[in-house]
């Protein structure tokens, strides 16, 4: 029987899963849109929804709770200062999942998970040293 089994294991240990979703939620908050496999996107959605709700509640304790969940202080700052005010009038449903075909190598179902009413300029912004050097040279 599968009583009480609500989450997918995704063929990872508990520590690996927790770290992966912390990184994915930080990436989603940073870029406001990421491409991943469909099962990972479906598991990431409730984690990010809860983080946005924490941001909307505000306060130091909620900020520390979000830091312990996400482990990225810069993205927690964006969550509380940018995303929380953006969704202050929306009661849940902050993200959407769009199916994006199948991956070439292993035919895995892919999906795009993004914030509703996202900032289009945030995608790809500050994506590491290569883009930073290109933007400084321009």
Curated annotation (Swiss-Prot):
The lineage of its organism: Bacteria, Pseudomonadati, Pseudomonadota, Alphaproteobacteria, Hyphomicrobiales. GO terms for cellular component: cytosolic large ribosomal subunit. InterPro entries: Ribosomal_bL17 (IPR000456), Ribosomal_bL17_CS (IPR047859), Ribosomal_bL17_sf (IPR036373). Part of the 50S ribosomal subunit. Contacts protein L32. This is Large ribosomal subunit protein bL17. PROSITE patterns: RIBOSOMAL_L17 (PS01167). Belongs to the bacterial ribosomal protein bL17 family. GO terms for biological process: translation. Keywords: Ribonucleoprotein, Ribosomal protein. It comes from Nitrobacter winogradskyi (strain ATCC 25391 / DSM 10237 / CIP 104748 / NCIMB 11846 / Nb-255). GO terms for molecular function: structural constituent of ribosome. HAMAP family: Ribosomal_bL17 (MF_01368). Pfam families: Ribosomal_L17.
């Amino acid at each position: 029987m599968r009583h009480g089994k609500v989450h997918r294991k995704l063929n990872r240990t508990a520590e690996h899963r927790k770290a992966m979703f912390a990184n994915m939620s930080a990436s989603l908050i940073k870029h406001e849109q990421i491409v991943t496999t469909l099962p990972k996107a479906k598991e990431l959605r409730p984690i990010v929804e809860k983080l946005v709700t924490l941001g909307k509640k505000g306060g130091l304790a909620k900020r520390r709770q979000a830091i312990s969940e996400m482990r990225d202080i810069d993205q927690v700052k964006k969550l509380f200062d940018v995303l929380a005010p953006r969704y202050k009038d929306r009661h849940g449903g902050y993200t959407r999942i769009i199916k994006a075909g199948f991956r070439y190598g292993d035919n895995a179902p892919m999906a795009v998970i993004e914030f509703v009413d996202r900032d289009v300029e945030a995608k790809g912004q500050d994506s590491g040293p290569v883009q930073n050097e290109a933007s400084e040279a321009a």
